[in-house]
From Swiss-Prot:
This is Dolichyl-diphosphooligosaccharide--protein glycosyltransferase subunit DAD1. Its main location: endoplasmic reticulum. The gene is DAD1. Residues 1-35, 81-98 are cytoplasmic. InterPro entries: DAD/Ost2. Subunit of the oligosaccharyl transferase (OST) complex that catalyzes the initial transfer of a defined glycan (Glc(3)Man(9)GlcNAc(2) in eukaryotes) from the lipid carrier dolichol-pyrophosphate to an asparagine residue within an Asn-X-Ser/Thr consensus motif in nascent polypeptide chains, the first step in protein N-glycosylation. N-glycosylation occurs cotranslationally and the complex associates with the Sec61 complex at the channel-forming translocon complex that mediates protein translocation across the endoplasmic reticulum (ER). All subunits are required for a maximal enzyme activity. It holds the Pfam family DAD.
Length: 119
């Protein structure tokens, strides 16, 4: 009984990943690029946290600035992805150029705050 349950669970997991892969293959290239950017920003934040755990956090302002910059940029990129997605009905009247301009402006404000926090 346990082995049959395990194999059906494994088959369900494989079916789930196959369906996710096929659904994601239909995603437009622009959204995939934004997804890569989000993944890069989050992985950079994780690398900084691991580095801080191993080496230490002597200039704590620098550590906080780096992590908050990465996470803030990732959050802004998620907002950009939501606004640019054609299937999202909430932002159908918003031009992609306007969404990108908002993203750039918010990133400038975020990084000015981060630079101010550094001192």
């Amino acid at each position: 009984m346990g082995k049959a349950s395990h194999s059906s669970t494994a088959q369900d997991a494989v079916a789930l990943f196959d369906s996710l892969r096929s659904a994601y293959s239909a995603t437009p290239t622009t959204l995939k690029i934004i997804d890569l950017y989000i993944g890069f920003a989050v992985s950079t934040a994780l690398i900084q946290v691991v580095y801080m755990a191993i080496v230490g956090s002597f200039p704590f302002n620098s550590f906080l600035s780096g992590v908050l910059s990465c996470i803030g940029t990732a959050v802004l990129a998620v907002c950009l992805r939501i606004q640019v997605n054609k299937e999202n009905k909430e932002f159908k009247d918003l031009a992609p150029e306007r969404a990108f301009a908002d993203f750039v402006l918010c990133n400038l404000v975020l990084h000015m705050v981060i630079m101010n926090f550094l001192g």
